[in-house]
Amino acid sequence: MARRARFSPRLHIPAARAALGPHLHFPRRRLVLRHCGVRAFVGDAIVSKKEMTNPLCAQAIVFGNGFVETYVRSLDPRLLGAYHALSRPVCERPLFAVRGWRRLFPIVARRLDAVERRTRRVLRSMCRTYTTCMSADRAAAVSHPVMRRRWFGHRATKTRRARLRRRCRNRSSKRRAERRKRFCNYCP
């Protein structure tokens, strides 16, 4: 039997990775919504059979903020790539692989459509919130010339004020400044 090109037998097992943060990791996430420059993703790391029917999480990529998660308990399983019937185990043939499943199971199709509409509404409102914040940040950055450099990181700000601001960040930089003062007779 021909399998999918990117089939993984461990698809229903959560992605075990080094903890890069408190967020869930989605190995093959898919884009479900693009709104005002913010892209919303959902992934296919399914933790359990229960989560097939009641998935957990959606992500949005926000410029400058990285990944942002919304934990939505009632996401559509089709969006997560689970492609399984409402209460079927992993080994069975998925409902969405059956030809004409919408006609055969109209109640399930209506329920899933309603869930998908609600999910997209949540994601759209989330994206709208983030684009509003981003446009406000961008307007503030354009109006304030010192803040505009922050878009390029602190290395672009080679001014004395930025050096002083960086110096008070951590102990090692304070120690280096003390050494410079002592040995080079130098005060930044």
Curated annotation (Swiss-Prot):
Transmembrane segments: none annotated. It comes from the Viruses. GO terms for biological process: symbiont-mediated suppression of host NF-kappaB cascade. It is found in: Host nucleus; Host cytoplasm, Host perinuclear region; Virion. Keywords: Host cytoplasm, Host nucleus, Host-virus interaction, Inhibition of host NF-kappa-B by virus, Virion. GO terms for cellular component: host cell nucleus; host cell perinuclear region of cytoplasm; virion component. The keyword Protease does not apply. Interacts with host IKBKG; this interaction inhibits host NF-kappa-B pathway activation. Plays a role in the inhibition of the host NF-kappa-B pathway early during infection. Prevents the host RELA subunit from reaching the nucleus and activate transcription. This is Protein ORFV073.
